[in-house]
A protein has these predicted regions:
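N-terminal secretory targeting modules
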Residues: 1-76, 90, 95
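Mobile, glycine- and charge-enriched loop segments
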Residues: 49-110, 229-234, 238-239, 249-250
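Extracellular/periplasmic catalytic domains that process cell-envelope and extracellular macromolecules
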Residues: 70-73, 93, 121-122, 159, ...
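Oxyanion-hole/transition-state-stabilizing segment in secreted/luminal serine hydrolases
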Residues: 80, 85-93, 98-100, 110-147, ...
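Charged helix-capping and loop-helix junction motifs
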Residues: 143-152, 183-191
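A short helix->loop->beta-strand "cap" motif at the edges of active sites that frequently abuts
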Residues: 160-164
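Catalytic His-Asp segment of secreted/periplasmic serine-dependent ester chemistry enzymes
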Residues: 172-254
Length: 254
């Protein structure tokens, strides 16, 4: 299938699904046949999902310049990961905590590892908070994602033995099924594997930020997302803030 045809398919399909994402979330049975056909078509119209490892170099360079010109917290609680970290106003949400936020772009775990020295090691953290769901959303398997988390954490432990790590669960979004048929399921599988991994290590702590995003009927709260259906709006982060505060407080040195 030509790249032009593939691009046109996704442009039209995304337009439809984005316009109906909230209704789909609330009434998925109405769209069962349409979504099934869409997923079948995705097997024909295959997107190029290759990631250039240094695609966020300009963002990292901006961090380098900022770090060189400003006094940063010593031994901060370091937030790293993808766009959910970027958009999180951590300085406001956790005022009084020594926070450094080094999320960038829609970073995948291999990209975080690639820029490890810039976004993690140089900051000498007293605690690290990690969030990244990009790999699964980009079609990678739970095994790929878990292994990437393990690689990142292993490298961190070599430099910062026994420093606590808060590993955030992968959040559901309104457009998981638009990304692909297995994305929502693979996020849940990944979360279960991360729980097992965290339980095997004394310095690693799994934080469930998914449950507060669901209503009493088990449906995802549509009102907590930006219009893109993927990123949290300010209301959405108010559901994360108390969960993370409790997790950080439980691990901070007295």
């Amino acid at each position: 299938m030509s790249s032009d045809n593939t691009a046109d398919f996704y442009k039209q399909s995304f337009g439809f699904w984005m316009a109906n994402k909230i209704d789909y979330n609330d009434n998925p049975e109405k769209y069962q046949e349409a979504m099934s056909l869409y997923h079948q078509a995705q097997k024909i119209y295959i997107r190029d999902r290759k990631i250039k490892i240094d695609r966020f170099e300009s963002t990292i360079e901006n961090y380098r310049r900022f770090d060189a010109r400003n006094q940063l917290p010593e031994n901060p609680i370091l937030f790293v990961g993808s766009s959910s970290i970027v958009f999180w106003e951590t300085a406001n949400s956790f005022s009084g905590y020594p926070i450094t936020n080094r999320g960038f772009g829609g970073a995948s775990l291999p990209e975080v590892i690639h820029y490890y020295d810039d976004v993690i090691k140089k900051h000498n953290p007293s605690m690290m908070v990690v969030y990244c769901d990009i790999d699964v959303e980009n079609g990678k398997s739970p095994e790929f994602s878990v292994n990437a988390f393990k690689e990142l954490i292993s490298r961190f432990e070599q430099d910062f033995a026994d420093i606590p790590i808060l590993l955030m669960s992968m959040k559901p979004t309104l457009i998981d099924d638009i990304f692909g048929a297995e994305v929502r399921t693979n996020k849940m599988i990944t979360n279960q594997q991360l729980i097992k991994y965290a339980n095997s290590k004394s310095n690693l702590h799994y934080v469930d930020i998914t449950s507060p995003m669901m209503d009493d009927n088990g449906k995802l709260k549509s009102e907590i997302f930006l219009n893109d259906g993927m990123h949290l709006n300010p209301l959405g982060y108010t559901f994360w803030d108390p969960v993370m505060k409790a997790a950080m407080d439980a691990l901070r040195m007295p």
